[in-house]
Amino acid sequence: MKEETMEVVCQSGALAGTELPVKEMIDQAFEAMGKAYVPYSGFKVGAALLSAEGTLYQGCNIENAAYTPSNCAERTAFFKAVSQGEKEFKAICIVGGKEGIPTGLTAPCGVCRQVMMEFCDPETFQIILAAEREEYKIFYLKELLPMGFGPKNL
């Protein structure tokens, strides 16, 4: 029987003192990636968003022929969760790759980072970028959106 291990590479001590269902989040993100609608780029992205209450929300990217109306996996997950009444979140897991085959780490775009800033504390919200099911890195939002502008600035 093969022993399963998770290679965890954390930035700034991410995960310290927290309990995240990392394996389940990665599995959910991979499942969501399989649902992506990407007839133009072929680049599939899946996300699994963890609410403060422990509920996981999946999101996938959805492309459109006009490109601008396309939506990223991360925003799909956030909008789904918010439309269900969630407003507080702990973490998100993101996985992506051409034709659904992971090609390294897939980081959120600037628009998705800004949506995260709207609902999440940049000091504590964690972003899991998975290259494979056993290979991932975890960042705090503040690391991916330094000097971010959010609700506290208004």
Which residues fall in each region the model found?
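Compact, glycine-rich, soluble single-domain proteins
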Residues: 61-75
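Short beta-strand scaffold segments in enzyme catalytic cores
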Residues: 42-50
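Alpha-helix C-terminal capping segments
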Residues: 50, 79-86
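Short Gly/Pro-enriched turn/cap motifs at secondary-structure boundaries
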Residues: 38-39
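Short, well-ordered amphipathic alpha-helical segments that serve as non-catalytic structural scaffolds
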Residues: 28-31, 73-81
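C-terminal binding/interaction regions
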Residues: 1-35, 84-154
